[in-house]
A protein has these predicted regions:
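M16 family metallopeptidases and their MPP-like homologs
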Residues: 1-25, 44-52, 123-125, 130-163, ...
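Proteolytic maturation boundary segments
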Residues: 5-149, 295-297
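A generic local secondary-structure boundary/capping motif
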Residues: 36, 284-286
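Polar/charged alpha-helical tracts
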Residues: 68-72, 232, 278, 282
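A small/polar active-site loop signature that marks catalytic segments
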Residues: 270-284
Length: 298
C-alpha cells in the first residue's frame, strides 16, 4: 500500500516522535468537543442499521423496533464507571523456593541445560534475534490423546476456556487490569499429543511471566461469567454457521484421515450443552500435576 500509493513508511521510532509532538496539541477538552460533533444530542447525524441471517422462521427487526431500542438506550441514566483494581500481588503467598540441582553446557548448539529440584528440565539460550524479547515454552507428552472420545466437547473447548479463566485470586477481567502496563503473557494449551505452556515478555517483566506460569500449574481461577460469555459466543457462531458443501467435505476428510476418531468431529451448537467447566479445570490440573514431565525453553 505504501509503495503503490507513494506514501512514506515510518519506523516505530519516527511514529513515536510524531506522536510526542501531536499529543500535547490534543487536550481532553478538544477531544470532548469533537465527540459532541460526532454524537449530536439532537441525533441529527445518526444512522441505524441491522444485519442478520436470512432464513425461514427468522423474526426481523423493524424500523420502529430499532428506533425504540435506540431511544430506550438514550433515556437510560448511566452511572460513571468506577474501575476497581485489586491492590494485591499476583501470587498471594510466595511458594517455597526451589533450587538448581545440575547445570550442563551444550557448546555445539550454544545453550545451557538446567535441572531443577522439582525435576523440571530447563534449556536456556541467549540470541540476538530480537532485542528486548524473552520467549518461553514448556511441553510435556500427553495431550488430548489420553482422554476418551466422550470428553470431545471439553477437549475442543479447553484452550479457549482456560484462556478465559482467571489466575490466583484474579478473575479474567481483574487479571487484565493487574497486568496493565506489563508486557508479559502466558498461555496453557492442549493439542493432541502434548500439553504446552507458552509465553513472552520483556526482560523487566520476566518475574511476572514466571508467576503466571506458576499459577497455570497451581491455581487457575474459575470464572463463571467469562465462561458463560464464551459459550454464548460459540452458540452464536455455530448457530449461524453456513452449511456448505466445502465444510461438509472438510469435516468428512478430517474424520476419515483420523480413522473415524470421534474426537475429530466438528462442534455443533447442541454439543455446548455438554460443556463442563469443572471437568475442563480438572483436565488442566491433571496435565500440569507434575512439573518434572516438562521441558522448558527460554
Amino acid at each position: 500500500s505504501n509503495y503503490l500509493e507513494k506514501e512514506p513508511l515510518l519506523s516505530i521510532e519516527q511514529t513515536y516522535q510524531i506522536m510526542q509532538q501531536l499529543t500535547p496539541m490534543l487536550p481532553v477538552d478538544v477531544v470532548n468537543e469533537a465527540m459532541k460533533q460526532l454524537i449530536s444530542l439532537s441525533d441529527s447525524n445518526v444512522v441505524i442499521y441491522n444485519t442478520t441471517t436470512e432464513k425461514e422462521g427468522m423474526v426481523y427487526s423493524t424500523e420502529a423496533s430499532l428506533k425504540k431500542a435506540y431511544d430506550d438506550a438514550r433515556a437510560e441514566k448511566i452511572e460513571a464507571y468506577v474501575d476497581n483494581v485489586k491492590q494485591e500481588p499476583l501470587i498471594a503467598e510466595q511458594p517455597k523456593a526451589g533450587k538448581i540441582v545440575s547445570e550442563k553446557e551444550n557448546a555445539k548448539f550454544g545453550y545451557k541445560e538446567l535441572t531443577l529440584s522439582n525435576g523440571a528440565r530447563v534449556l536456556l539460550k541467549k540470541t540476538n534475534l530480537k532485542e528486548g524479547e524473552v520467549l518461553f515454552n514448556g511441553s510435556s507428552k500427553g495431550g488430548k490423546s489420553l482422554y476418551d472420545a466422550k470428553e470431545r466437547v471439553n477437549l475442543d473447548l479447553f484452550n479457549d476456556v482456560i484462556s478465559y479463566s482467571g489466575l490466583g485470586n484474579f478473575s479474567s477481567t481483574e487479571l487484565q487490569k493487574v497486568l496493565a502496563g506489563k508486557n508479559a503473557n502466558v498461555n496453557l494449551s492442549l493439542p493432541n499429543l502434548h500439553e504446552y505452556v507458552s509465553g513472552s515478555c520483556t526482560p523487566k517483566d520476566m518475574e511476572t511471566m514466571f508467576q503466571m506460569n506458576y499459577l497455570y500449574f497451581t491455581n487457575i481461577k474459575k470464572d463463571e461469567q467469562a465462561f458463560n460469555s464464551l459459550i454464548n459466543q460459540y452458540r452464536a457462531a455455530l448457530k449461524n454457521k453456513s452449511p456448505s458443501a466445502e465444510s461438509a467435505l472438510q469435516d468428512s476428510v478430517t474424520y476419515t484421515l483420523h480413522a473415524h476418531d470421534a474426537r475429530q468431529i466438528s462442534l455443533e451448537e447442541k454439543d455446548l450443552d455438554n460443556a463442563n467447566y469443572d471437568r475442563i479445570l480438572q483436565i488442566a490440573k491433571e496435565r500440569t500435576a507434575n512439573a518434572a514431565d516438562f521441558t522448558f525453553t527460554i
